Amino acid sequence: MSEKIVQLNEEVIKGQLKELVRGSVEETLNELLEAEAEKLTQAARYERNEQRQGYRSGHYNRNLTTTSGDVTLKVPKLKGISFETAIIERYRRRESSVEEALIEMYLAGVSVRRVEDITEALWGSKVSPATISELNKKAYVPIEDWRNRPLQGGRYPYVYVDGIYLCRNWGGEFENVAILVAIAVNEDGYREVLGAAEGMKEDKASWISFFQWLRGRGLDGVKLVVGDKCLGMLEAVGEVFPEAKYQRCTVHFYHNVFSVTPRSKVKLVAKMLKAIHAQESKKSAREKARAVVAQLRSMKLKEAARKVEDGIEETLTYCDFPSEHWTRIRTNNVIERLNREIRRRTRVVGSFPDGNSALMLVCARLRHVAGTQWGNKKYMNMKHLEAALEDASIAG
């Protein structure tokens, strides 16, 4: 008797298994959302009890891309209480990291075969080589939208600016391109990434264009701009934000003095400079600065003395603001930490094919950082500034 041979269609089976897994993932995630809602409201659906916080108001659908495929989340709508699900938040962080990784792969010259393997691991399907470049273009779109978003944090009293130099391969020749970066502390005391733009070089025209772009997106209420003494920046601040004052970063100022100081005397000079900015008033800081200049001259450090004498006043602007804010507004450290992270990420690329590629990778990183605890943790108590403004001690 002949035996029946059963032929299995491997592709059909794989498709059915994938759909089974996708369905299971979708069901599990929706159960987790319901559990989150129950925990927040302290009650199950339709349950009435004295501990209940808020009420159900149906659901809304939200698509989520997972390694098992696209799933539809039924997100509970609540009345009387806000519902920020941890699942969506984790997705946002993952989405930002995927965009950044995709751009990095493209810029770093990863082989097409390797990119195919990675995209299959991320999205569950292998893309063709012709599609890879399109994926990178698509990754640029949300980053560019974020970069040009309206600034809605109200007023931004403190603004920090800096420039990052990255290497660009322009027609076979390597040259540096400046990416101008700005962050701020808003009127509620939270840090916010304002934006980044290609500046070609740090000059007056680039800074004016950058500041006007920020102002056009909603940057307002600027009282102080903190940054290094870059070429043309001080003049640009005066033109675009005439009511704002300028604070030269004390750390950059120190390094400028160290550049003309013998290595054997740097530690001593650093101690002398820090003593100036440890004073409790602008008057005493000026007096201390005069003493430091005299001491430097007695040490035969005439060039260092000249730099201190010429530049010290620009480093004392912070004294016009609440003393509670001094340590955080006299340096550019808050933006320098971000820049170090950006440099760590861009170092693996080496040289960029164009300025826009460099800008997109920088913005991808800034966008990621902005969505973390960095931007959600209060940085300053702005009531001190409000009180000072009411006393008209900073007006003008």
List the predicted regions and their residue ranges:
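Acidic/histidine-rich catalytic cores and adjacent linkers
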Residues: 2-4, 35-38, 42-43, 107, ...
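Subset of Sec-pathway N-terminal targeting signals
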Residues: 2-12, 20-30, 34-55
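Metal-dependent DNA phosphodiester-chemistry modules and their immediately adjacent helices/loops
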Residues: 84, 257-291
